[in-house]
């Protein structure tokens, strides 16, 4: 989600260390200490303006959430939502999420969310897709045995590609939704993109895949 640079974004992030982890490399293997409890840790890669991660944190107070985004302006808007929600079970990371092993120990997180990731439709960009096998290698490391990836997209091509990628990797598909919003799935929290696409009548796809 590309947005214009927000004036004061850096200062806003730095002024809220209770939510924004300013030294993420030092947090590796210490996340439960940072949260102050042993609750499960769920991570969203590419959290955008934070509607999903803040909504999930409010909906599930006994789960710790971490939202990751590389764009500081976007993350500052996510921080706005966190502050508005008044939740304490959330942290934000202003980092490139291409190698999460820089920030998480093996098996340190319990679930990973990939919501509306860049589909990188051209074949030559296949390795950039977050459901490509090298990313799955990384995700498998930081998740526990039988750890799960929950994936949503509006892009049919990326959805089909990801189903194949998960299956070829040996993952178990615990749930596949071909039209999430027309299903009986309960507890869905929408991202900004999801709300936008849904308002246009676009189908939303969802997968729960287990290592």
Curated annotation (Swiss-Prot):
Binding locations of substrate: 122, 154, 191-194
Keyword Transferase in annotation: yes
Enzyme Commission code: 2.1.1.33
Broadest EC class assigned to this enzyme: transferase
One GO cellular component term: tRNA methyltransferase complex
GO molecular function, one term: tRNA (guanine(46)-N7)-methyltransferase activity
InterPro entries on file: SAM-dependent_MTases_sf, tRNA_(Gua-N-7)_MeTrfase_Trmb, tRNA_methyltr_TrmB_bact
Biological or metabolic pathway of the protein: tRNA modification; N(7)-methylguanine-tRNA biosynthesis
UniProt catalytic activity: guanosine(46) in tRNA + S-adenosyl-L-methionine = N(7)-methylguanosine(46) in tRNA + S-adenosyl-L-homocysteine
Region annotated Interaction with RNA, chain positions: 124-129
Active site: 118
Keywords, alphabetical: Methyltransferase, S-adenosyl-L-methionine, Transferase, tRNA processing
Amino acids binding S-adenosyl-L-methionine: 44, 69, 96, 118
Segments traversing the membrane: none
Reported function: Catalyzes the formation of N(7)-methylguanine at position 46 (m7G46) in tRNA.
Protein family: Belongs to the class I-like SAM-binding methyltransferase superfamily. TrmB family.
UniProt xrefs under HAMAP family: tRNA_methyltr_TrmB
Protein name: tRNA (guanine-N(7)-)-methyltransferase
Gene: trmB
């Amino acid at each position: 989600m590309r947005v214009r640079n927000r004036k004061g974004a850096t200062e806003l992030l730095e002024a809220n260390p209770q939510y924004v982890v300013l030294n993420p490399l030092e947090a590796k293997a210490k996340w439960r200490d940072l949260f102050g409890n042993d609750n499960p840790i769920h991570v969203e890669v590419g959290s955008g303006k934070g509607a999903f991660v803040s909504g999930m944190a409010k909906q599930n107070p006994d789960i710790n959430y971490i939202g990751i985004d590389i764009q500081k302006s976007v993350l500052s808007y996510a921080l706005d939502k966190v502050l508005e929600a008044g939740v304490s079970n959330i942290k934000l990371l202003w980092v490139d999420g291409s190698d999460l092993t820089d920030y998480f120990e093996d098996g340190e997180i319990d679930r990973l969310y990939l919501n509306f990731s860049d589909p990188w439709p051209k074949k030559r960009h296949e390795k950039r897709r977050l459901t490509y096998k090298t990313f799955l290698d990384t995700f498998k490391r930081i998740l526990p045995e039988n750890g799960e990836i929950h994936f949503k997209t509006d892009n049919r091509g990326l959805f089909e590609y990801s189903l194949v990628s998960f299956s070829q990797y040996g993952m178990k598909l615990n749930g596949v939704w071909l039209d999430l919003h027309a299903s009986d799935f309960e507890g869905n929290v929408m991202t900004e993109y999801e709300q936008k696409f849904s308002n246009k009548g676009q189908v939303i796809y969802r997968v729960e895949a287990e290592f």
